[in-house]
């Protein structure tokens, strides 16, 4: 990597500092930012390829426009590392990005006035920008939504496009195209025609001409429409994307997204045009790092503690333990062999949910619908209606976007769609927009729905296999953490063929501890610590949140008056809410202590510290248990821990 003796980056404390630089200095700044991003992400992890691809574009935008007076709205927001470096963030906080004490990996209004929204989900930037443009249309404010090409697989983006009006000024859509295949234009005539037709003056003159023609008595509107069609046809000769013109956006481009001089020149020309514009910018993901540029999907996001070897390959320092997504991917592949008609649907999460092997083995039965969660759910419902088994693999945080589809198209029809809900629980480095801690709140209310969560890899595999027999909508939620490879008890697969049965992991006398999914491990650790205080606990895994095992808990509450619920979910609407409904229905009077995610917004952080912040680390829970129940240390029971 290049060594810089005089850092321009260190002199940038706000976007205004950019305006003092020459074009050559802006290019040097881009290389310094690229060097900084690579060197930091090797240590911290984060979104690599997308941030390397948008550096020059971000610099040019901040050079021409004036944030925060002008409004930059980044779709998704994971590609904003350059934006952060140019808008006065603390460089030490950037070097800890996505970790405790560091910057968010997405835009965050808590960090800067230059960040307008908390971000993390795709497809909403255009709607947000249109709202802001409407509210500020009488001011001098420019509104610039910056969208990746993936945003155009979202229905919400097209809903917003359909609402754009021709009289909307200072509204400039930036399409950051790092994936579309644009046919190359051939020949001098084509190049000249393209430069003329896509020049801002051509757009301005054609719009003025159409308005003037429309004022001609009687035939004006017809003549204006004809003029618009001629203009559109001329554009379509050299541009394969005339669709934007149909949505009242004057199309300009494509332009090289790594040519700062060309970008600055174009932005300066279009800045004050009195109609909405879309600028098509072509960039390369992973720009400046060969391995990331060659495989942008693999290097879209990298984990912490990666290192660059002399061979320019990113290698993990240690062999990681299998995670729940790893187990999911492997098990689904096995089920694909057992069930020759099994289909798998995902909304652009094939790599994250470890479905690449299934995709390669059964390509005709694997469907990636793009960032279109609602369609993924309803499409899966259509497959299920045709008596074909289907798994819809989706992140918990993205399932929110398809709530109506889950109700209307799956549960109301009682179709056996199996939802593999990935990233259930805290998202750690990804932060508040990605925490999977709300899905139980709405899934519990869905008619016909089965909901469960495994405590170990063994139970996970057995639940997935059993779900093919349930013949009802089902949701198996799981976190993105190393999976418990063993299991506290020998599990019989037939136990899960009839959903709704919980399991006793360990018996005691003084208190009942109920742990959901991977929190069973925390429950067993708490049991051991309580034993040192002479307190004996029963530990139970409900496995199924819905249907709830009323019979098992009715028996257990005959012998326990103190209950502890532990779940990595919001305290509103999760396992504890289901348990409280059970208590009210059967009129049990017991003392309940609930550990869950408080009803607040929690940002990013490392696993250990974030668990401490929400009160879900074992030591904090033990202290609170002893205080809450006023337990006093007594002589530990002589009998050893019994496992049944």
From Swiss-Prot:
Keywords: Isoprene biosynthesis, Magnesium, Metal-binding, Thiamine biosynthesis, Thiamine pyrophosphate, Transferase. It comes from the Bacteria. Thiamine diphosphate binds at residues 78, 120-122, 150-151, 178, 373. SMART domains: Transket_pyr (SM00861). Pathway: Metabolic intermediate biosynthesis; 1-deoxy-D-xylulose 5-phosphate biosynthesis; 1-deoxy-D-xylulose 5-phosphate from D-glyceraldehyde 3-phosphate and pyruvate: step 1/1. Mg(2+) binds at residues 149, 178. InterPro entries: Dxylulose-5-P_synthase (IPR005477), THDP-binding (IPR029061), Transketo_C/PFOR_II (IPR009014), Transketolase-like_Pyr-bd (IPR005475), Transketolase_C (IPR033248), Transketolase_CS (IPR049557). One of its GO terms (cellular component) is cytosol. Its cofactor is Mg(2+); thiamine diphosphate. Disulfide bonds: none annotated. Its EC number is 2.2.1.7. It catalyses: D-glyceraldehyde 3-phosphate + pyruvate + H(+) = 1-deoxy-D-xylulose 5-phosphate + CO2. Pfam families: DXP_synthase_N, Transket_pyr, Transketolase_C. NCBIfam families: dxs (TIGR00204), PRK05444.2-2 (NF003933). Catalyzes the acyloin condensation reaction between C atoms 2 and 3 of pyruvate and glyceraldehyde 3-phosphate to yield 1-deoxy-D-xylulose-5-phosphate (DXP). Belongs to the transketolase family. DXPS subfamily. HAMAP family: DXP_synth. Homodimer. This is 1-deoxy-D-xylulose-5-phosphate synthase.
């Amino acid at each position: 990597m290049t060594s810089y003796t005089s850092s321009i980056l260190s002199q940038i404390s706000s976007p205004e500092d950019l305006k003092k630089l020459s074009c050559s200095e802006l290019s040097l700044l881009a290389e310094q930012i690229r060097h900084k991003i690579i060197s930091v992400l090797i240590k911290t992890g984060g979104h690599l390829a997308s941030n390397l691809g948008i550096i020059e574009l971000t610099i040019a935008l901040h050079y021409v426009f004036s944030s925060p007076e002008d409004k930059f709205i980044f779709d998704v927001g994971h590609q904003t590392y350059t934006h952060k470096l140019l808008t006065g963030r603390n460089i030490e906080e950037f070097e800890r990005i996505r970790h405790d004490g560091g910057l968010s990996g997405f835009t965050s209004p808590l960090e800067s006035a230059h960040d307008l929204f908390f971000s993390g989900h795709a497809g909403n930037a255009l709607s947000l920008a249109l709202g802001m443009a409407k509210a500020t249309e009488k001011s001098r404010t420019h509104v610039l939504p910056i969208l990746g090409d993936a945003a155009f697989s979202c229905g919400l983006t097209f809903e917003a496009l359909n609402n754009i009006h021709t009289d909307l000024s200072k509204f400039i859509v930036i399409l950051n195209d790092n994936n579309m295949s644009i046919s190359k234009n051939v020949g001098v005539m084509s190049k000249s025609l393209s430069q003329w037709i896509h020049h801002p003056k051509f757009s301005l003159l054609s719009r003025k001409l159409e308005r003037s023609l429309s004022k001609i008595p009687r035939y004006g509107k017809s003549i204006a429409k004809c003029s618009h069609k001629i203009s559109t046809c001329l554009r379509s000769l050299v541009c394969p994307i005339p669709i934007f013109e149909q949505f009242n956006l004057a199309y300009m481009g494509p332009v090289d997204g790594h040519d700062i001089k060309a970008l600055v020149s174009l932005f300066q020309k279009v800045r004050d045009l009195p109609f909405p514009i879309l600028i098509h910018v072509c960039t390369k993901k992973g720009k400046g790092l060969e391995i990331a540029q060659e495989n942008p999907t693999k290097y879209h996001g990298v984990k912490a503690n990666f290192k660059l070897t002399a061979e320019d390959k990113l290698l993990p320092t240690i062999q990681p333990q299998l995670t729940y997504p790893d187990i999911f991917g492997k098990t689904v592949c096995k089920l694909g062999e057992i069930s020759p008609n099994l289909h798998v649907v995902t909304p652009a999460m094939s790599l994250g949910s470890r479905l690449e092997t299934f995709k390669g083995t059964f390509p005709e039965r694997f469907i990636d619908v793009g960032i279109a969660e609602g369609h993924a759910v309803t499409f899966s419902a259509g497959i299920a209606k045709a008596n074909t088994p289907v798994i819809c693999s989706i992140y918990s945080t993205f399932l929110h976007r398809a709530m109506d589809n889950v109700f209307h198209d799956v549960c109301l029809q009682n179709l056996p769609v199996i939802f593999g809900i990935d990233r259930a629980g805290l998202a750690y480095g990804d932060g508040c927009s990605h925490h999977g801690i709300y899905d139980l709140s709405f899934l519990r209310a869905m008619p016909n729905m089965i909901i469960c969560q495994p405590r170990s890899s063994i139970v996970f595999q057995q639940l997935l296999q059993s779900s093919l027999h349930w013949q009802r909508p089902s949701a198996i939620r799981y976190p993105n953490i190393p999976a418990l490879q063993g299991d506290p008890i020998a599990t019989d697969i037939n136990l899960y063929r009839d959903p709704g049965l919980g399991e006793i992991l360990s018996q005691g006398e003084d208190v009942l501890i109920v742990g959901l999914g991977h929190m069973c491990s925390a429950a067993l650790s708490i049991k051991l610590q309580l034993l040192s205080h002479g307190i004996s606990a029963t530990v139970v895994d409900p496995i199924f949140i819905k249907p709830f095992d009323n019979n098992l808990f009715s028996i257990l509450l005959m012998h326990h008056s103190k209950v502890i619920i532990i779940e990595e979910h919001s305290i509103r609407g999760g396992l504890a809410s289901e348990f409280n409904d059970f208590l009210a229905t059967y009129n049990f009077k017991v003392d309940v202590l609930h550990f869950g995610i408080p009803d607040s917004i929690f940002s990013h952080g490392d696993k250990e510290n974030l668990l401490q912040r929400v009160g879900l680390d074992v030591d904090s829970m033990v202290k609170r248990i002893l205080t809450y129940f006023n337990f006093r240390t007594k002589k530990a029971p002589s009998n050893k821990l019994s496992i049944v």
